[in-house]
């Protein structure tokens, strides 16, 4: 347990941030899963639409520092490659 007043405050702030980030991370994963589900069904149009919704969210989470910018780029590139493979 925190001993000083500032340590207690920092513990409270840390817990608030943890919960907020957990919510955002869950939202990010949900949107990525929607794209993957659309890809697995083989529907190119649905996958493209889901990717168009997920792409700015992935970028936003990278900007906020929730995920690394390289991870965001990697996720988008891999999803886009899978969508393009559907069209071929």
From Swiss-Prot:
A GO term, aspect molecular function: structural constituent of ribosome
A cellular-component GO term for this protein: cytosol
Superkingdom assignment: Bacteria
InterPro entries with a match to the protein in the record: Ribosomal_bS20, Ribosomal_bS20_sf
Keywords: Ribonucleoprotein, Ribosomal protein, RNA-binding, rRNA-binding
Region (Disordered): 1-27
Signal peptide (from-to): none
SUPFAM superfamilies given in the database record: Ribosomal protein S20 (SSF46992)
Keyword RNA-binding: yes
Presence of the UniProt keyword rRNA-binding in the record: yes
One record GO biological process: translation
PANTHER family on file: 30S RIBOSOMAL PROTEIN S20, SMALL RIBOSOMAL SUBUNIT PROTEIN BS20C
Its job: Binds directly to 16S ribosomal RNA.
UniProt family annotation: Belongs to the bacterial ribosomal protein bS20 family.
Protein name: Small ribosomal subunit protein bS20
UniProt organism field: Shewanella amazonensis (strain ATCC BAA-1098 / SB2B)
Lineage: Bacteria, Pseudomonadati, Pseudomonadota, Gammaproteobacteria, Alteromonadales
């Amino acid at each position: 347990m925190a001993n000083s007043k500032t340590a207690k405050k920092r513990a409270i702030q840390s817990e608030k941030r943890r919960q907020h980030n957990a919510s955002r991370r869950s939202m990010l994963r949900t949107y990525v899963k929607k794209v993957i589900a659309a890809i697995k069904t083989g529907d190119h149009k649905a996958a493209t639409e889901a990717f168009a919704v997920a792409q700015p969210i992935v970028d936003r989470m990278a900007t906020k520092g929730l995920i690394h910018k390289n991870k965001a780029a990697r996720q988008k590139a891999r999803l886009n490659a899978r969508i393009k493979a559907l069209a071929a």
